[in-house]
Amino acid sequence: YKADRLLSGGTGKVKGVTIHNTNDLKNVEEDAEQYTRATWPNANMNDARVHYYVDDVNAWQNLREDEVGWHAGDGRKATGGNETTLSIEIIMDGSGSKEDLKAEENGVLLAALLLKKHGLSVNELYTHNHWMGHPDSIVQGARKNCPLYILPHWAQFKQKVAAKLTELNGGATTTEAGKTEIMGKAKASAQQMALFARSK
């Protein structure tokens, strides 16, 4: 990770959103805050850098949205996940608890908000597996499967993001290159936008 490097060859253009899972912290209420503090200022995450951590309570931003992260396992490949996409770590434990489900729901919302903000469609929503050359499913014997808890139902997760994106577009369907089939008024509640309220 090198600070202040801009996405997409220095243009800062966001070309997608990559979804990850990281483990829930035991006996911690706001995991996203703790992961952020482990990154800044404690430097306990080594070179790993993601744009957002999201839990069942809120989201914390770790990098500017035009900045290159270090999360996709594909190095400095010009067309890869590190160099072109925003990253979201959804904090879960795979238990199916109400906290787990809420964290995933918040991840759906954040992904949709970011896709909308940057004029992207659900076709630009990726798994970590995608950038490592794996299918969007659990791969036996793989070095890593990520997002571990979402991969088994990735298609449904993606459908939820698509539905939320359509809702944010006022009922319009976002297509390639950020175009909409029918223009509608974008709406987001105060509760939805509150996910962005806490950042480093």
Regions found by a protein language model. Name each.
Residues 1-121:
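Active-site-adjacent loop/helix surface patches within enzyme catalytic domains
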Residues 2-11, 86, 91-181:
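Basic/polar, cationic surfaces and motifs that engage anionic cell-wall
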Residues 24, 132, 196:
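Alpha-helical and His/Cys-centered functional microenvironments
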Residues 27-31, 127, 145, 191-194, ...:
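Secondary-structure junction/capping motif
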Residues 28, 45, 142, 147-150, ...:
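Short linear sequence motifs
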Residues 34, 61, 140, 156-159, ...:
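Residue-identity detector for glutamine
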Residues 177-200:
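Short, solvent-exposed alpha-helical surface patches in non-cytosolic proteins
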